[in-house]
Amino acid sequence: MLGFARLVAHALAAFGLVGLLMTGFDYFSNVTGIPFLMFTINPNTNVIHLVTGLVGIEMTGRADLARRYLLLVGAMGLPWAVVGYVVEGTMADFFGRNPALVHFHLGVSLVALLLVLWRRWPVLPPTQPTADPVDGGSI
């Protein structure tokens, strides 16, 4: 889980930074976006990816914070992806997303939530009778 959290954080930060270098802050809410790899991006999505990645880089130093980071990525990314499917290609999509970017958000969100919600029950060793703390005798 920690490795996936670090991978997501670094990938989002790099994606956001390179995207901002490509788009700058011109046409901040361009509904069409510009092509980047197989995605379309605009400054809105780049800033969101960069901030999410930088927060994640800071949070993935500890396992408990990495788990919270993945919970945030999943809890925020899942509705983000669903809305992306609904408004994709319309003028309401001021993030300029395309289906590939929406699929990416959905996949990362689902894997993040799966890792957070997956319960690994600890295997407890069999208990041995212990001394009674009151009288010092055995149980």
Where are the regions that the model predicts?
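Membrane-interface extramembranous regions
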Residues: 1-139
